[in-house]
Amino acid sequence: MTTWNDKHRALTDLRENAAGMSRNKQVLHATALSSQIKQEQVPVVRREMVRALVAFPVVEAESGLEFAITDEDADIRVIACQGWGKRQTDRAFKLLLKTWRSDTEIDVRVAAIQAIGNFDGEQVFAELVKALSDRDPAVQFAGIQGFRKFSGEDWGEDPETWLAWTQGERPEVTYNGRENIVDLLNPANLFR
């Protein structure tokens, strides 16, 4: 009988060694994981399977990741969103967009909008603006993080400042002492 520790160790090894494998081995492992994840009943094991799948850049990993983005466990959906965010494909963008718009768990929506920030285009811009306008501060912050990746700009932590920037303004960034030292020392914030 295989224990949880054995499975965890094997999946961790698989994840850590994926990049060094030949393409054929990556395809073999990604195909097997994509199939196994659909049969696995234990959420923690599925979670580790998804983490391993994310490490495989081959298309064969995508069926397992697509299954994972609709998993009943929100933590698994979050990891799937992060994984899809590393894949710059139309399929990845569409799945993330659907998840951002329809998932009921805030953590999953946050992960989806953060991942959407890795993409380019007008639709990405529009979705990030929607995130900035959301009522939930976690979603607003995810929108800010997405815009930082999308634009390379840094307008602080205030969603209103970012919204002004999206409308073509060069907003004044004022610091009220609640920012962390990293924000204060960011070169983009020192030389405005």
Segments and roles (model prediction):
Residues N5-R15:
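HEAT-repeat alpha-solenoid elements in large eukaryotic scaffold proteins
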Residues T2-T3, Q41-V42, E72-D73, T104-E105, ...:
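Short inter-helical turns and helix N-cap capping residues of alpha-solenoid HEAT/ARM repeat scaffolds
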Residues A10, M49, A80, A112, ...:
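Conserved hydrophobic register position within alpha-solenoid helical repeats
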Residues E153-R192:
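Terminal, low-structured helical/coil segments at or just beyond the last alpha-helical repeat
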Residues M1, G20-Q39, V58-T70, T89-S102, ...:
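Amphipathic alpha-helical scaffolding segments comprising HEAT/armadillo-like alpha-solenoid repeats
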Residues D13, A52-A55, G83-K86, A115-N118, ...:
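Core register positions within helices of long alpha-helical scaffolds
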Residues R51, S63-F67, A74-Q114:
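Alpha-helical adaptor scaffolds
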